[in-house]
């Protein structure tokens, strides 16, 4: 569920940024213009402005559709979990009810991480876990995308994950079938060790759900990583990324999860 909420927050930030670049509000001065007295170049300039404004508004409409979709999924998932809990309470005996009252809860299938190191704890992968998924193309340190685990199958080494971002047409994100070598677990929030400067990592680029190779420049007091992403157009540009969204590079990981 956290993955859906992260997408909602990220989408709302995208809408805010879109308004900062090209305000959604109508320009009063534009309404007062007399287009009949303008030259062809002036008309073309205004036409370009209107087209950019329209494209920006249409893009925001698609983002809002995605927000509504993710909020709906969150609400449905919450209802399903509540329904399952009520069913369990009705079917289980007094002993199970006592266990539940003490905070004990049955756990479904548990997935196992393949990639692990001192900078990315070997925590179990569960339904709802956030992961970085590598599409089956390119190198291990190519682009990875943030997904949410929908299903743990087989013996915990295969998964179904969903891209929470809609496609270019605004349709729901794709569902992928993958194995544990194609996933990197995003730490669920517990403390993680800081990377030393010079460490090669995969980090989620701000305002996207895509992970790219980067080099750690340093770490701030709050744990935020200062990074230099590979391929940045601006030379020596530093970017700050939340620690939990900075993952060890698969090619640099020394410890592999045991079967």
Curated annotation (Swiss-Prot):
The modification Phosphoserine is found at residue 139. Residues 163-165, 207-210 are annotated as: Histone H3K4me3 N-terminus binding. It is found in: Nucleus. GO terms for biological process: chromatin organization; positive regulation of transcription by RNA polymerase II; protein localization; regulation of transcription by RNA polymerase II; SAGA complex localization to transcription regulatory region. Changing residue 205 to A: Reduces histone H3 acetylation. Signal peptide: none annotated. Its main location: nucleus. CDD domains: Tudor_SGF29_rpt1 (cd20393), Tudor_SGF29_rpt2 (cd20394). InterPro entries: SGF29 (IPR037802), SGF29_tudor-like_dom (IPR010750), Tudor_SGF29_rpt1 (IPR047288), Tudor_SGF29_rpt2 (IPR047287). Changing residue 229 to A: Reduces histone H3 acetylation. Residues 75-102 are annotated as: Disordered. The record marks 205, 212 as: Histone H3K4me3 binding. The keyword Nucleus applies. PANTHER family: SAGA-ASSOCIATED FACTOR 29. Chromatin reader component of the transcription coactivator SAGA complex. SAGA acts as a general cofactor required for essentially all RNA polymerase II transcription. At the promoters, SAGA is required for transcription pre-initiation complex (PIC) recruitment. It influences RNA polymerase II transcriptional activity through different activities such as TBP interaction (via core/TAF module) and promoter selectivity, interaction with transcription activators (via Tra1/SPT module), and chromatin modification through histone acetylation (via HAT module) and deubiquitination (via DUB module). This is SAGA complex subunit SGF29. The gene is SGF29.
């Amino acid at each position: 569920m956290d993955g859906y909420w992260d997408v909602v927050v990220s989408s709302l930030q995208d809408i805010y940024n879109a308004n900062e670049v090209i305000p959604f509000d109508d320009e009063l001065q534009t309404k007062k213009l007399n287009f009949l007295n303008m030259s062809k170049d002036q008309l073309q300039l205004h036409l370009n402005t209107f087209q950019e404004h329209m494209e920006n508004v249409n893009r925001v409409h698609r983002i809002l559709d995605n927000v509504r979709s993710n909020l709906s999924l969150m609400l449905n998932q919450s209802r399903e979990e509540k329904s399952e809990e009520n069913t369990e309470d009705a079917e289980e005996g007094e002993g199970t009810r006592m266990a539940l009252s003490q905070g004990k809860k049955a756990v479904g299938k548990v997935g196992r991480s393949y990639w692990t190191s001192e900078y990315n704890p070997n925590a179990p992968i569960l339904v709802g876990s956030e992961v970085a998924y590598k599409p089956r193309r390119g190198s291990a340190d190519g682009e990875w995308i943030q997904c949410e685990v929908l299903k743990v199958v087989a013996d915990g080494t295969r998964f179904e994950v969903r891209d929470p971002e809609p496609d270019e047409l605004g349709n729901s994100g794709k569902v992928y079938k993958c194995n544990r070598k194609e996933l990197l677990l995003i730490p669920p929030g517990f403390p993680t060790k800081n990377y030393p400067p010079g460490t090669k990592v995969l980090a989620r680029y701000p305002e996207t759900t895509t992970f790219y190779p980067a080099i750690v420049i340093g770490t701030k007091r709050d744990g935020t990583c200062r990074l230099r992403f590979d391929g940045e157009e601006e030379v020596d540009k530093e970017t700050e990324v939340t620690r939990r969204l900075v993952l060890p590079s698969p090619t640099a990981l020394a410890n592999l999860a045991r079967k």
